[in-house]
């Protein structure tokens, strides 16, 4: 059913526009026949149950990325907040680049992000290709009304005649051909009688317009290509600038929300809708286009061409590589749908281009996971610690909260034994100033366990420390009376060497070391971060169930998730989602 109005989560420049439209009853009397269609069909409909209609219109020629997530959240979020409906529409007007694989992936990604398009008994999943017959019918009507003509100039000639920002264009020699002659040529184009690029249908507007987009823009081109849905039924395909307003109007869209690069196209958008409404082809009220700044992140590229190059040339391990900005990459990295929605909600919807710092995305997933992620311990760079006065073969139980934010989550238990694994960084033979962890003679607390005093260490032939020895103080076990009688400045994490679970851990970081890898004339490949992926053999706290998608906060280290692709029950593979705090330093 249609979403009930809910208080908006955040403000942006589109909200006052929608609120003014609703207050002015701009859409009062708007009819909806239960499916998209022209004016004649909608006239048979009922009052539209949706207060507003928006749409997310991806082209099925690639995988969705974090920039698309912003548009998804804006369009679905506004529909939700104002008692409306958001359509998912595939803009499949370019058959040579589109595939069913991408359609399926986009549907999966939008669902994963937490949005649905069903409402009032309608699926609201649409394809531009469903409207090809309407578009062609409308094109003929425009030709007959003198608003369009078939041009036989080459693409180069059309480009040359367009003029410049300071000089008007020149009329095509075919601009004033009789309407019936253009109609005949258009039908020949439709019937496949002309080769690719030989003829185009152009709108007849104004070759002297200061807006180059109104200098008789192309509406249809000949393209003998197989479409992933319509097969070979069509050999002419609409240009996006012609298809876009028609699709919006057929679907009863009220607020067509685009990114800023379409701002200059809005006059043509309005022109198309006005002419077709005058001809009785489209129902009023007509859609209106609004533009907002696309989401640009530092340390990220979202160009499909560049992302494809990264995949094809092996710089990443596919479209779902956890370093990729694709939604599937973020999902595999361990980002939750709610964390991405939170990030999008925290970024402004404005008319001004800007770059959002990547750290805001990382902070969103921290804020999302912190209240819910169970705690555990992992040792990523292990060093053996032997408690020399602890009996061999003896195992004690220590306990810790599963989640300090949720007392109902209970406690977890794990063994304390003579031999432990600690982090290499938690020992120094010669400590620097203000180093409070293990070094000869120093005392620290093994978190949730005992206070220990370092008594020695062992090196291998290369001089590397391979083992540390310590004695524990039996009366200092955490959670027991008198445990705090010995004051220490350092706490370190540990796992039992005999019980820890071995795992491969991928330490992911930003894919690019340059904040603006696609800026200016840079070679974006030269900006890659050589340390964006490091793999270590780690030891995990026993009791961890390494099922795909499971997520933990490993204390002192960050948030980690089980890899959905490579992990196996007998050989866990984990991905670092994000560190506990922002400590980024460019390579």
Curated annotation (Swiss-Prot):
A motif ('KMSKS' region) lies at residues 301-305. Its EC number is 6.1.1.18. GO terms for biological process: glutaminyl-tRNA aminoacylation; glutamyl-tRNA aminoacylation. Monomer. The keyword Nucleotidyltransferase does not apply. This is Glutamine--tRNA ligase. It holds the Pfam family tRNA-synt_1c_C. Belongs to the class-I aminoacyl-tRNA synthetase family. GO terms for cellular component: cytosol. L-glutamine binds at residues 91, 240. It comes from the Bacteria. Its main location: cytoplasm. A motif ('HIGH' region) lies at residues 58-68. It is found in: Cytoplasm. It is an enzyme of class 6 (ligase). It catalyses: tRNA(Gln) + L-glutamine + ATP = L-glutaminyl-tRNA(Gln) + AMP + diphosphate. ATP binds at residues 59-61, 65-71, 259, 294-295. It comes from Bordetella parapertussis (strain 12822 / ATCC BAA-587 / NCTC 13253). PROSITE patterns: AA_TRNA_LIGASE_I (PS00178). NCBIfam families: glnS, PRK14703.1. Gene3D superfamilies: HUPs (3.40.50.620), Ribosomal Protein L25, Chain P (2.40.240.10).
